[in-house]
Every structure is written in C-alpha cells, then in structure tokens.
C-alpha cells in the first residue's frame, strides 16, 4: 500500500486548468510503472492547503473517480491547515470539513487527514463530535510534532487514551495517521530496528482500541534531531532518523515500519514536495528503489 503525496504543482502537465488533480494522478501512476514500482496509494489536496477554499472542479471530480477506479488506487485527502474542529472557529471549520468529507465520498477518496492539536483528548473528542460521519470516509488524526506541550500523541499511552475516549464516545470513522518524522521530532527514537520495533509492538498491543484497518502512515525521514519539535521532512535514509543505516538498511527502524505496514496492509505515503518535478522524481526513484529492496 505504498505511495506518495501528489502535488498538482509538480505532477500536472503545464497549462492544466480543469482536471489538474486527475491529470496529476495519471502522470503519477505512469511514473510508478516507469520505475517498476506500481503505486497502490496516493495523497492529494482537494482544498487549501492554507485557505479554506475547495480547489477541485466539477469536471475533475468525475474524471478523478474514474481514474481511482481504473487503477484501483487507495487515495486519501489531506485537510487544510485550518481544519481544526477543536479550535475557537469550530463552527465554520466543522462546516468546511463536512464539505471535504462529502467530496471525498463523491470521488472515491477513502479518508481525510487532520492534524492533531497539542490539546487534551477531551477537547479533540468534543471537536470530532461536531462532525457528521460520512460512510466510507475515515478521518485520520495525524500525530503532531512538538517539543514542549504535554500532549504530543507520540507515546502509546497518549494515543491509547485518545482512542479509548473516541471509542467510548461511539465516534465512527476515526483513524490514526502516524507520521514518522513527527513522532521523531516529538522525542521518540525510531532509528534502529529494535527501537522502532518496541514502539510498533506497543501499537500492536492496542489494536483492540485502534485497529490496523484504521491506521495509515506518513513515511518520512527527518532533517532535524530527535526531540527538536521541528517538522522538516527528508528522503528516506537521507535524514537524521535513518541516514546512519543507509548501508545496513535491514537494521534500520524503517525496515521495521515497512514490515508492520506490509503485515497489516496499511497505506503508507511518502510526503515529498521538492522544488521541481525533476528533483521530486529523482528523489522518489531512489526511495522507491530502496523500498523495493526492503520488500523482498
């Protein structure tokens, strides 16, 4: 279930004006076939990202659904950076998130990723209760990156506490998005196979609370030190999490994550947004070649 973030800025044909998301996905699928790594998943923006504006047009909706069905892709949308239903602007935000969820349903997108805030679980649950569930579309709560806040949602104790509240409140269609760069930035050492294995075994121990069917990953290395609180992604084995394992990749924490993802068939997205299409495709070619070797 491996794939990447598909930015229409970097993936669509120049001059594209109407069906740019579909065009981007078509080029992305062709690229995967070209490098010998057929993609099973993708992540897109259908709104924003920095403004509460829907940016998928009606023609694009029709063609995107056809594209997703044709290639049997699992696609998730990333919410805008304003999608914080536990904020003081929650009435407007909740309405906008509802629009995004309905569009996801319409075009065959399986989920919407929302950034978790560094706030108490009860506030998050109260915010989620304001959103009407949309059948077939999961809201994935993404692990945040922070250094000083009490609630980081990078430890299994805090993740379990949050999802127990979600389950006990009978909220439906809520999942977890684990960003490896974010949990590293929040102070979790996942560098070695053993370190990552310890964290992932703890995750497996709470599958009764948050099942793997509702877990996805943002598979990113990090350009900053463990516990920095800074969100800066890097290509796999090029950042501070796993670079020291670039010549012994099966001893790395990344290999342990790949094993978990494969064992439980979780979607995993590489989030790269480099300066040019050529830079992006060069980086992704190297990363997916490495992933292919880990999957053997």
UniProtKB/Swiss-Prot annotation:
Belongs to the AP endonuclease 2 family. Its cofactor is Zn(2+). It holds the Pfam family AP_endonuc_2. This is Probable AP endonuclease. One of its GO terms (biological process) is base-excision repair. Optimum pH is 6.3. Binds 3 Zn(2+) ions. It comes from the Viruses. Endonuclease that plays a role in DNA repair. Cleaves phosphodiester bonds on the 5' side of apurinic or apyrimidinic sites (AP sites). In addition to endonuclease activity, the ASFV enzyme has a proofreading 3'-5' exonuclease activity that is considerably more efficient in the elimination of a mismatch than in that of a correctly paired base. Displays 3'-phosphatase and 3'-repair diesterase activities. The single nucleotide gaps generated by the AP endonuclease are filled by the viral AP endonuclease and DNA ligase. CDD domains: AP2Ec (cd00019). Induction: Expressed in the early phase of the viral replicative cycle and accumulates at later times. Zn(2+) 2 binds at residues 115, 142, 218. Its EC number is 3.1.21.-. Disulfide bonds join 16-20. Zn(2+) 1 binds at residues 78, 271. It is found in: Host nucleus; Host cytoplasm; Virion. InterPro entries: AP_endonuc_2 (IPR001719), AP_endonuc_F2_Zn_BS (IPR018246), Xyl_isomerase-like_sf (IPR036237), Xyl_isomerase-like_TIM-brl (IPR013022).
């Amino acid at each position: 279930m491996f794939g990447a973030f598909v930015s229409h800025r970097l993936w669509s044909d120049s001059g594209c004006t109407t069906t740019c998301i579909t065009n981007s996905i078509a080029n992305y699928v062709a690229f995967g076939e070209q490098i010998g790594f057929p993609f099973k998943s993708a992540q897109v923006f259908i709104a924003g990202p920095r403004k509460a504006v829907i940016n998928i047009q009606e023609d694009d909706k029709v063609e995107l659904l056809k594209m997703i069905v044709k290639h049997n892709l699992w696609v998730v949308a990333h919410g805008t950076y304003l999608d914080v239903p536990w904020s003081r602007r929650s009435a407007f935000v909740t309405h906008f998130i509802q629009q995004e969820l309905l569009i996801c349903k319409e075009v065959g997108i399986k989920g919407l990723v929302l950034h978790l805030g560094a706030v108490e679980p009860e506030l998050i649950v109260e915010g989620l209760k304001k959103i009407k569930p949309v059948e077939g579309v999961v809201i994935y709560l993404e692990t945040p990156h922070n250094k000083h806040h009490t609630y980081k949602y990078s430890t299994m104790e805090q993740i379990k506490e949050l999802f127990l509240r979600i389950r006990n409140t009978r909220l439906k269609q809520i999942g977890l998005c684990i960003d490896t760069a974010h949990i590293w930035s929040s102070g979790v050492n996942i560098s070695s196979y053993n370190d990552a294995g310890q964290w992932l075994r703890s995750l497996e121990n709470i599958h009764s609370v948050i099942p793997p069917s509702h877990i996805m990953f943002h598979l990113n290395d990090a350009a900053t030190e463990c516990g920095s609180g800074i969100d800066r992604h890097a290509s796999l084995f090029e950042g501070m999490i796993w670079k020291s394992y670039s010549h012994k990749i099966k001893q790395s924490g990344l290999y342990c994550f790949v094993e978990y993802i494969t064992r439980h068939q979780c979607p995993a997205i590489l989030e790269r947004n480099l300066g040019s299409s050529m830079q992006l495709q060069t980086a992704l070619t190297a990363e997916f070649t490495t992933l292919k070797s880990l999957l053997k």
